[in-house]
């Protein structure tokens, strides 16, 4: 194997050993020394925390108002039933939010196979036990909400945002969206021709059956690559600053004098002088206003007090008045 000492070996998929339908070993080699742990740890974290999937998020059980209760004829208490529902492995095509229904009566176990669903839904573990009915007259009916997400979202993280609209009897469930149940990696020595200082990465994972192990590795690698894209080009790329255009005048000056809520006498006097906007008013002096017919010192004092309450006064000098927007009107 000839090449520059600065060149890095690129790993390739060597083997996928399917131990069972939900358990597989994936081997990647060769890797430069140290890259086995670097990539193995990164992929492990992504596979555990960031893989998308579907999970039960809410449940409504007929006759049950809260999770700290029991139901007649059901062997398990409601908390245990909710815990069992978390173990459902569901694949959903084309939808992010669905409602499944379950109706069962008579003595015996209630399993995932008893759930009613349409063709867009596949329950991977139909033999998964949800609860047991202990009486021939016992029955259970529930509506199960399944949503798409990623990682782990506890019910406590959603209870405050949904509490106002959530009816009594709708029980929130801790949602574990990740289809990967367990993952571990091991790094062994590898050899390529004369080089013996290389790594072999062995990733062993168990899933809930809703995702193929090879596809899981591919998705995790894609997520990692997308996150690292920002470091590929470290040029200082700055977002263009959006300069906020400051209004030419204080917005209050563009409001009509009607907003000052003056007395009828004062308002009519200003209207007679064609003073329509507050800006027209503040540019007048006390002497000019006192020349207005029927506007005495009492009205002048009222106008000054109202303007002062808004941080304005008479005799202000404003340039470029009136603005084009008003002049055009």
Curated annotation (Swiss-Prot):
<dbReference type="InterPro" id="IPR036643">
    <property type="entry name" value="RNApol_insert_sf"/>
</dbReference>
<dbReference type="GO" id="GO:0003677">
    <property type="term" value="F:DNA binding"/>
</dbReference>
<keyword id="KW-0808">Transferase</keyword>
<dbReference type="InterPro" id="IPR011262">
    <property type="entry name" value="DNA-dir_RNA_pol_insert"/>
</dbReference>
<dbReference type="InterPro" id="IPR036603">
    <property type="entry name" value="RBP11-like"/>
</dbReference>
<dbReference type="InterPro" id="IPR011263">
    <property type="entry name" value="DNA-dir_RNA_pol_RpoA/D/Rpb3"/>
</dbReference>
<feature type="region of interest" description="Alpha N-terminal domain (alpha-NTD)">
    <location>
        <begin position="1"/>
        <end position="235"/>
    </location>
</feature>
<dbReference type="InterPro" id="IPR011773">
    <property type="entry name" value="DNA-dir_RpoA"/>
</dbReference>
<dbReference type="Pfam" id="PF01193">
    <property type="entry name" value="RNA_pol_L"/>
</dbReference>
<comment type="function">
    <text>DNA-dependent RNA polymerase catalyzes the transcription of DNA into RNA using the four ribonucleoside triphosphates as substrates.</text>
</comment>
<dbReference type="Pfam" id="PF01000">
    <property type="entry name" value="RNA_pol_A_bac"/>
</dbReference>
<dbReference type="GO" id="GO:0005737">
    <property type="term" value="C:cytoplasm"/>
</dbReference>
<dbReference type="GO" id="GO:0046983">
    <property type="term" value="F:protein dimerization activity"/>
</dbReference>
<dbReference type="GO" id="GO:0003899">
    <property type="term" value="F:DNA-directed RNA polymerase activity"/>
</dbReference>
<comment type="subunit">
    <text>Homodimer. The RNAP catalytic core consists of 2 alpha, 1 beta, 1 beta' and 1 omega subunit. When a sigma factor is associated with the core the holoenzyme is formed, which can initiate transcription.</text>
</comment>
<keyword id="KW-0804">Transcription</keyword>
<keyword id="KW-0240">DNA-directed RNA polymerase</keyword>
<protein>
    <recommendedName>
        <fullName>DNA-directed RNA polymerase subunit alpha</fullName>
        <ecNumber>2.7.7.6</ecNumber>
    </recommendedName>
</protein>
<keyword id="KW-0548">Nucleotidyltransferase</keyword>
<dbReference type="GO" id="GO:0006351">
    <property type="term" value="P:DNA-templated transcription"/>
</dbReference>
<dbReference type="InterPro" id="IPR011260">
    <property type="entry name" value="RNAP_asu_C"/>
</dbReference>
<feature type="region of interest" description="Alpha C-terminal domain (alpha-CTD)">
    <location>
        <begin position="249"/>
        <end position="329"/>
    </location>
</feature>
<dbReference type="GO" id="GO:0000428">
    <property type="term" value="C:DNA-directed RNA polymerase complex"/>
</dbReference>
<comment type="similarity">
    <text>Belongs to the RNA polymerase alpha chain family.</text>
</comment>
<dbReference type="Pfam" id="PF03118">
    <property type="entry name" value="RNA_pol_A_CTD"/>
</dbReference>
